[in-house]
């Protein structure tokens, strides 16, 4: 029985190249559709694929066609209404029809087309969702105590496994060896062939000499052919070696206010922000740890499940979370070896005497050691003392950023604003 094995890169997805070209060509429209769709999802369904719709007019391409003027002769087979030389009135183009997602006004005439809708995968969705985003001020530090290595190409070697064989380099060595081993014989062969050509046309004929030359030529050709086309001496393998790499390990502190002033809608918006942050970190970076801290009057380090699903609540003392973060940094994360980040979400409601203490802890202990600290206030009310204290920090520290979220639609734009990739002249 004959077996066919499909080793093509695309395999079953034979239109992958065309699909990628389409995504590149209409990236702006797709990203706009994704940014609108992210706010309509449930908290637990942020990272799945998405049905993307693009207006038909945006994907139309230029084409050559005949002009509207003039007379034309056409053959319409199968009609029973017209005969030869009948003139057919040209139909008027409809301009009042519906087109798009069904959100327009009704029309009694005209034609249109629905928006073009297609499905993108989870990977494509996340790639577009987090495109052009990065952790600010990320630096690579050489960790003495961390044995982190990366494999690099390091030329060629004469020993290795068949999977690493370099066909081109092996054939080059084979050609060089065969040329070196047969060069003298080929020169001698060329001389004998020239001599045989001269003798064969000479008069009188020298049959014995011709026979001798033919024997020598045959022997030389046999010797040349006995040189193997490729030998184990010719084989070369791609060589790889492990080199110590600068480590870009980072830790992200997620500080969420779960006090009684945070209603369920506000908590859901905070969770949406942190889920986006978690997906961004896990999608973009390999060596990023996440520390989850929930706080009301007391702060507690928790795991991922408790951070998102615990129902515990209480009063509001924001400084408790900042103190706990400072303790964890001193205990586990040396600023000289770690890139430290923090994202704090709150409704801004805090005990009045505690807000100046938050300012002091951030200014003296945390901001000098973190790469970037972001504060997100989720409220529709007027800003209170915590926001005003943080405004002074923003004016003093370049690595402190703050944003205001009023509604669910603000989450993704604020997230992109906080983690927008810096240009070369802006990076530290």
From Swiss-Prot:
It comes from the Bacteria. Residues 78-111 are annotated as: Disordered. Residues 92-103 have a biased composition (Gly residues). Pfam families: DUF444. Residues 78-90 have a biased composition (Basic and acidic residues). NCBIfam families: PRK05325.1-2, PRK05325.1-3. HAMAP family: UPF0229. Belongs to the UPF0229 family. This is UPF0229 protein YeaH. It comes from Salmonella dublin (strain CT_02021853). The gene is yeaH.
């Amino acid at each position: 029985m004959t077996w066919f094995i499909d080793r093509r890169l695309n395999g079953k997805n034979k239109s992958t190249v065309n699909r990628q070209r389409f995504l590149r060509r209409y990236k702006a429209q797709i990203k706009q559709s994704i940014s609108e769709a992210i706010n309509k999802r449930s908290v637990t369904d942020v990272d799945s694929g998405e049905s993307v719709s693009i207006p038909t007019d945006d994907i139309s391409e230029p084409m050559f066609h005949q002009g509207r003027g003039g007379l034309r002769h056409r053959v319409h087979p199968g009609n029973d209404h017209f005969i030869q030389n009948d003139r057919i009135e040209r139909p008027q183009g409809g301009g009042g029809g519906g087109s798009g997602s069904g959100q327009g006004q009704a029309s009694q005439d005209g034609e249109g087309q629905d928006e073009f809708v297609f499905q993108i995968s989870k990977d494509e969705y996340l790639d577009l969702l987090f495109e052009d985003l990065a952790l600010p001020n990320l630096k690579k530090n050489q960790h003495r105590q961390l044995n982190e290595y990366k494999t690099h190409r390091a030329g060629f070697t004469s020993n290795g496994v068949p999977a690493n064989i370099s066909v081109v380099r092996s054939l080059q060595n084979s050609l060089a060896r065969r040329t070196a081993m047969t060069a003298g014989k080929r020169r001698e062969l060329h001389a004998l062939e020239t001599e045989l050509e001269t003798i064969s046309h000479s008069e009188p004929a020298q049959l014995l000499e011709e026979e001798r030359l033919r024997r020598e030529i045959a022997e030389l050709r046999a010797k040349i052919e006995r040189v193997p086309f490729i030998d184990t001496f010719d084989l070369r393998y791609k060589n790889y070696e492990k080199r110590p790499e600068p480590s870009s390990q980072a830790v992200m502190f997620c500080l969420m206010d779960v006090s009684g002033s945070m209603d369920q809608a506000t908590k859901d918006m905070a969770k949406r922000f942190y889920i986006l942050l978690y997906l961004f970190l896990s999608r973009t970076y390999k060596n990023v740890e996440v520390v989850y801290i929930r706080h009301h009057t007391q702060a507690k380090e928790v795991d991922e499940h408790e951070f998102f699903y615990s129902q515990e609540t209480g009063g509001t003392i924001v400084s408790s979370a900042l103190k706990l973060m400072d303790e964890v940094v001193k205990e586990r994360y040396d600023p000289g070896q770690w890139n430290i980040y923090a994202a704090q979400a709150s409704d801004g409601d805090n005990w009045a005497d505690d807000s100046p203490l938050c300012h002091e802890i951030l200014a003296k202990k945390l901001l000098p050691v973190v790469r970037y600290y972001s504060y997100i206030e989720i409220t529709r009310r007027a800003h209170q003392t915590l926001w005003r204290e943080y405004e002074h920090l923003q004016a003093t520290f370049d690595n402190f950023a703050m944003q205001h979220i009023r509604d669910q639609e603000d989450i993704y734009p604020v997230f992109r604003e906080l983690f927008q990739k810096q240009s070369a002249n802006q990076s530290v």
